[in-house]
Amino acid sequence: MSIRYIDEISDLREKKIFMRVDFNVPLDEHQNITEDTRIRAVLPTINYALDYNAKVVLASHLGRPKGERNAKYSMAPAAKRLSRLLGKEVKLAPDCIGDGVSKIIDSMQPGDVVMLENLRFYPGEEKNDDDFAKALADHCDIYVNDAFAVSHRAHASVEAITKFFPIVAAGFLMKNEMSYFEKSMKNPIRPLVAILGGAKVSGKLEVLENLCNKVDKVIIGGGMAFTFLKALGYNVGKSLVEENLLETALNTYNKAREKGIKFYLPVDCVVADQFNPAAETKVTTIQEIPEGWMALDIGPATVTLFSTALQNAKTIVWNGPMGVFEMDAFSRGTFAMVSAVANSYALTIVGGGDTDVAVHRAGEYAKISYISTGGGAFLELLEGKKLPGIKVLEDNGHK
């Protein structure tokens, strides 16, 4: 079965639409939103519904309130920001279920927007509880999921809720996410290059194993590279290594090589005597990492190697930074890779693992073909998994 999208629903006019969005945005200590990409990403879907004078009921979680009310995790800042972006009032409901919410939804006028309070104030959300899902669905006519970033979670507002709606669809953000995933993984223009970074191999091994059936080249940077390098016999000093995964890393490396995949690892790195922005640093080759020092970024020769490997790429998928880019001394490798990816002639898809943050910080946002809003969801798609939120959309898309 295929997913039905909101623009394939024949009659939205004045209907009450329950829209699952992901407004899990970062806040500062004064409850101000510091980055609103996730809110802006669903504006096309909300505006499309409003063009049909629909009544839009938005539902999201924020943070981890652990199944109980906590003012710190209120959706109020998100409702306020959305109101500004839409140029119209977004009413914040006092709860996400209950009589008070039902009254608000029943009294909505065509073109009204209501934001429900944090879904995770109830344990039923993360337990995928049917009763909680039914309570959410009450009083609405159509279900729309436009929260790709939580679609790998079998939660009540993502999965169970679809049982209680006659019409189930996805929004335009979801459409973009699925479209770019298919362009990069299902029908890629080759050569297809995967860049994987970040601290740990453990979160990426399944991704790597799945990618080995699809890609032409793999580039490994970040802390995870040093588990591979140690497995290959290099002395990596105090660099981050997952000792329990050395054998698995070596097997994955050998398997990729057997399949004819070009497998790139760092040839030099920026090392420090301690994990500290003020640490003493120097550039060394991989063969000469001093005892007691740790590698915290890729070096200039590696940047050249990786950039050259990208030159003939037609599709690039990137997840995870090349070093501890939050510290200025170890940010150059990641920013150089952002530049190499942004200035390539390939279709470029970036997702999760702080890679999107690095792209924003480097000011190259506009040159990337697509930046995924999903961290864990993006990774699970790369692993070849069926996401619960996507599966129910496929199963119920044309019921």
Swiss-Prot record:
Name the CDD domains on file: Phosphoglycerate_kinase
The gene for this chain is pgk
Family recorded in the similarity comment: Belongs to the phosphoglycerate kinase family.
Indicate where this protein resides in the cell: Cytoplasm
| Pathway of action | Carbohydrate degradation; glycolysis; pyruvate from D-glyceraldehyde 3-phosphate: step 2/5
**What GO molecular functions are on record for this protein?**
ADP binding; ATP binding; phosphoglycerate kinase activity
Is Hydrolase among the key words of this record?
A: no
Instruction: Fill in the subunit field for this protein.
Output: Monomer.
Reactions catalysed, semicolon-separated, are: (2R)-3-phosphoglycerate + ATP = (2R)-3-phospho-glyceroyl phosphate + ADP
Q: What is this protein called?
A: Phosphoglycerate kinase
Say if the entry is tagged with keyword ATP-binding.
Answer: yes
